[in-house]
Every structure is written in structure tokens, then in C-alpha cells.
Amino acid sequence: MTDVDKKDPQYKQIFLERFRKKLQSDKTGMSDLESFVELPEGITPVAASIGPIKRGSEPLPPWLKLNVPKGMTHRPRFNRIRRSMREKKLSTVCEEAKCPNIGECWGGGEDNGAATATIMVMGSHCTRGCRFCSVLTSRRPPPLDPDEPEKVAAAVHEMGVDYIVMTMVDRDDLPDGGASHVSRCIRTIKEQNPELMLEALVGDFHGDLKVVEQLAATPLSVYAHNIECVERITPRVRDHRATYKQSLQTLEHVTKWTNGKMLTKSSIMLGLGEEEEEVRQTLRDLRTAGVSAVTLGQYLQPSRTRLKVSRYAHPKEFEMWEKEAMSMGFLYCASGPMVRSSYRAGEYYIKNIVKQRENAKGATTMEAVTAADAVAAGA
């Protein structure tokens, strides 16, 4: 529009009118953005859109529309956990990720003695940029809080929960990935809460097995590391520093190094473009690595900048995967659309497995651990 001065008050209106006419007179037979914009190589028109960005191409299916229980904020245990976290300025994945199961987990103790909460340590900024995760990313996050282990331990004591899940952000900027800090958090929590069952959901620490051993040597009840998705789509879904084989190696090493006495756990998301046989193979790979507990849940896009959902798996499919996982030899499997890696982590069955394995810690063979698992299964 070289014939119209940009300073002209009518410039915008004239431009829009001419652009509309160009769209109407298009003779290419194409009516999308590709007709008017030369996109860079490797970028398809699907990657660009005009208008409001939607969180998914389809509306949520009915099984993902939950009714929030009324009166949850008036339940004593729910409020006690929330108040303790606020006062000590600590973060929970339950709130950060807007988990739909927060009421069931935090208030669980009032119904079945299995209240759980998930605390995130080492700050709120991660050095990795997985495309499914909503946690903030930074190359140089703020320094660690040296008082965090004591704060977390005190908060856990005040919560009065039976089972705590402690997760972490990746800190590739630190020499040991933050393992020494996480280890101190674990030991401090257990010192102040000796009867508590503690699950640590940790990263891969670049596959440094010595660092993995450092964490496995702490008084943990469950060592968890999520494989997240099937192998084929891992490069697209996870940060390039997190690989499928590295995750399997981490989990397998914990099992072997502890002679099977440490319960290992992992999680798989559905709805990222995986095929049925790929999910089955991932379960096989986890079981071969010695993983005893697994969860499967529906991936939901946390923000506009994250990966879109490829499909919504039906509840019947999740039931199928639970049956298959148990038939493969997993001791525990939680599988459902709203299941997350820490979902009802402290429920009776998994707690019983942990107790039986702790009783078998004096044993020196895998057979003794297997016998303990059999006792737990029959409880």
C-alpha cells in the first residue's frame, strides 16, 4: 500500500478492506494462510493459527469433566495441609499443576487414612524444557535455599499425612544436579517423621549412576522416575537431555543396586500420539527394568504453549492397561483418565508392599524380596 500514507487515520481501514478483497479474489483454490505467507522449511500451516488458541481440537469428553466435591475447603486435614504450605512458602505439585485429585489426596486421611501430598523442592524453575510440562524454565535458576530441608520436614510434620511424595525440578546447572540437596531433604524429613512413608519422584541426573546410588541409599520408601511416554515420541515430548533408555537405565540400576529391596515406580501419559503396541512395549521395558509400580493417565495440555492432546483415551482403555500391567507382574498399577504419577500414592496396597520389603531388608537375595511381595499381595 505504497499509495497510502501510514500516518493517514484511515490507513488501517483501507488496508483491511484491500486485504479482504484479495482473499475474496484468490484464484489458487486455497483459502488458508499458506496462500499468503511463505513459511520456513519444515513448518507447516498447521503450526500457525489465526484467532483464539484453543487448548485442544476437541471438547473434553464427559469422563474428564469432574464435579468438585462441595465443602472440601472446610475439611480440617485439607486446610491444615494448605495452611502449612502457605506459611512456609513451599510449593506443591498438587496446586502448581492444578491437579483435579487434590481433594481426594489431601483429604484422604479423613476417609481412609491415606492422605498424601506432593512437595516440589529446589525452587520453581527447571533447567529443562519438556513440551508437556507447565513448570517454568530457566538456564540459571535462583540459588538453592539451604534451609529448605528443615522447612519441608517441619511442614510435613504439621500436615499430619501418612505418605508424602517429594518431587524436584531438574537443576542441570548444579554439579550433581541437586542430588545432595534432595538427599538432605529426604534424611531431614525422615529424622523428624520416622513413621512417615516417603516417595521421591526424581530426575535422571544425566544418567550419572553414582548420583542415583546416593539417593537410593537414603531412607526412601519408593524411588520414582517417570518415563513419561513411549520411546518413539520421546524426542518430541521430553527435553533432549532426557532419553528413554537413560530413564530405563536409571530405574534398572536402582533395582539392582538395592538388590530389589527398593520399590521403583514410573508413569506413562496417553494422548501424545502413541500407538497401542508402543504402550505395551513400554510396560514390558519398565517391568524388565525391575519397576514394580506403574501409573497411566491422560495427558492434558497445561497451557497454550505446550503440546496439544492427540486423543482422549476412553476409560475402558485404561482398564485394559491396568489388567495388562498386572498380568506382566507389576505389583501395583493405577490407570485412569485422571490418574497422575502421585495419584493416591499412599493407598493401603502400596504401603503394605513397602512395609513387607522393609521387613525383608536384612535379606540378601531377590528371592527373599519376592517372598515379601507375595505376603503383601495376600494381605
Swiss-Prot record:
Which positions are annotated as binding [4Fe-4S] cluster 2? Answer: 126, 130, 133
Query: Can you give the residue ranges of the Radical SAM core domain?
Result: 109-331
Q: Which UniProt keywords apply?
A: 4Fe-4S, Iron, Iron-sulfur, Metal-binding, Mitochondrion, S-adenosyl-L-methionine, Transferase
Cross-referenced Gene3D superfamilies: Aldolase class I
Q: Copy the pathway line from the protein's UniProt record.
A: Protein modification; protein lipoylation via endogenous pathway; protein N(6)-(lipoyl)lysine from octanoyl-[acyl-carrier-protein]: step 2/2
The GO terms describing molecular function are:
4 iron, 4 sulfur cluster binding; lipoate synthase activity; metal ion binding
- Give the note describing cofactor binding and stoichiometry: Binds 2 [4Fe-4S] clusters per subunit. One cluster is coordinated with 3 cysteines and an exchangeable S-adenosyl-L-methionine.
Catalysed reaction per UniProt?
Answer: [[Fe-S] cluster scaffold protein carrying a second [4Fe-4S](2+) cluster] + N(6)-octanoyl-L-lysyl-[protein] + 2 oxidized [2Fe-2S]-[ferredoxin] + 2 S-adenosyl-L-methionine + 4 H(+) = [[Fe-S] cluster scaffold protein] + N(6)-[(R)-dihydrolipoyl]-L-lysyl-[protein] + 4 Fe(3+) + 2 hydrogen sulfide + 2 5'-deoxyadenosine + 2 L-methionine + 2 reduced [2Fe-2S]-[ferredoxin]
One Pfam entry name:
LIAS_N
The superkingdom of the source organism is Eukaryota
Q: EC number(s)?
A: 2.8.1.8
Q: What class of enzyme is it?
A: transferase
Q: One GO CC annotation, please?
A: mitochondrion
List the SUPFAM superfamilies hit by this protein, alphabetically: Radical SAM enzymes
Q: Which cofactors are named for this entry?
A: [4Fe-4S] cluster
Residue numbers binding [4Fe-4S] cluster 1: 94, 99, 105, 342
Q: What is its subcellular localisation?
A: Mitochondrion
Disulphide bridges = none
Please tell me whether the keyword DNA-binding is annotated for this protein: no
What HAMAP family does the record tag this protein with? Answer: Lipoyl_synth (MF_00206)
Question: Which protein family is named in the record?
Answer: Belongs to the radical SAM superfamily. Lipoyl synthase family.
Name by which UniProt lists this protein: Lipoyl synthase, mitochondrial
